[in-house]
Amino acid sequence: MSRYLLRDVQAVLRGVRKVAESSLKLETEKVSLRLGDFRSQPSLRSVPASLTSRSQAFSLQEIAARAGVVLRGVQQQFRNVTGVNAAPVVAFDNGSVLYSERIHSQSSQKQAPTTVPTGSVSNSPQPEGKANEAAERAKQFMNPPVAPMDPVDKNEFVAMPEMGRSNGNGENKQAADFMKNQGDTDMDSQYAPDSSKNTKSVPTKEIVAEDGSMSIEDIKKATQVTPGVAVKNEGV
């Protein structure tokens, strides 16, 4: 908490510095006007210039001393309230320069955030930029690059969406085209035995009794297939 209070006091001191600078400018203008009036008088034109410069310098030093007293009073009040010695912060030079800005910039550099990336061997703090590099490495580890596919697999992968493409009615386009080209042709006909080959047909009507019943032996004979011989059943 004292750190934040110190920053507030520094802000107050910066305001006091601006007021002191404004007062210094006003007093300088007043001194310049007085010197102008003093030089304009005929009876006092013989006054040496060194005397007037000493008078102006005395006025500036007096203003600086008064401003320094004010700042030292603020410093003492700050020490009484917080118990922190703020002497390096409240440094006044010739009534116009406060060193609080320089010290504040140094303290901000010392308080820069530091992080230690995951997987680091040493526990020494690393700059914040190293954390971004660690995040990139973790991202690449979680999402490794995929190996390129072979040309054959790539062609098959490209052809796969065509299989599932719909013609707008929820039907498979390739299947619909295939059935359209086939017409009313029974798909089982392409597996029918070739008549040019030596085939033996076993008509089922010869083994069916008059009452339509079939014995087990007849069923075995009807369904028995000789190797190399295709059997074609005919309906009753």
UniProtKB/Swiss-Prot annotation:
Record bears the keyword Ribosomal protein: no
GO CC list: mitochondrion
MAHS motif, short sequence motif: residues: 126-143
N-terminal signal peptide: none
Record field: transmembrane: none
Keyword Transmembrane helix in record: no
Region described as Disordered: 102-135, 165-209
The entry's keywords: Mitochondrion, Stress response, Transit peptide
Residue ranges with Polar residues bias: 105-126, 192-202
Location relative to the cell: Mitochondrion
Transit peptide segment: 1-73
Record's miscellaneous remark: Improves osmotic tolerance of human cells.
Domains (record comment): The MAHS motif is conserved in tardigrade MAHS proteins and forms a predicted amphipathic helix.
Task performed by this protein: Mitochondrial heat soluble protein acting as a molecular shield in water-deficient condition.
The name this protein goes by in its record: Mitochondrial-abundant heat soluble protein
Gene encoding the protein: MAHS
